[in-house]
Amino acid sequence: RCVQTAHFMKEARGKLPEDAADNDNFRVLRYVAKITINPAIAHGVAHVIGSVEAGKMADLVLWAPEFFGAKPKMIIKGGVINYTVMGDPNASLPTCQPLMYRRSFGALGGANGQTCATFVSKTSFNNGIKERYGLEKQVIAVENCRAISKADMVRNSYAPVIQVNPETFAVTIDGVHLTVPPAKECKLNQMYFFS
């Protein structure tokens, strides 16, 4: 939905002022931040996950370019392949049909506990919740999730004045009346998902 929204807003509202004439890199980074680092900041776990940086968990999603935003090729959790597209597990080659999403090395056995984390309050962490409950996953205390605001969000800190007229339901942002027509098409839809 995030990629669909990014495309729809570009069609409805035009290019962002920060984007170059020949690309939408800022828009892409902005919408990627909405589903990666910004939720991590809001939930107090950005010191561990949410971006690719030294010292953080190696959580990555790899995409074939033609399926970006729709169907990931591989999900790497804690530096180990956790979920991937694989063929028949009894076959001698990994690409034998039918290709399906399957759990991989990082999601099996004891690896799951080593590549994942359970986030708890600092009080729970200090009271030894991991030992008390016998948890196998890493237990990490959340940090700074009460004193954050929109200004702390990455590439999404704009906080306009939003007003809704109670009689006409007209929405204005910074005094500008906004209307967006219904979508006529949605990217990454039926072409990628059969139902």
Give each language-model segment a name:
Residues 1-66, 72-78, 82-87:
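His/Asp/Glu-enriched, well-ordered alpha-helical/loop segment
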Residues 67-70, 86-171, 176-195:
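Non-catalytic terminal accessory/regulatory regions of metabolic enzymes
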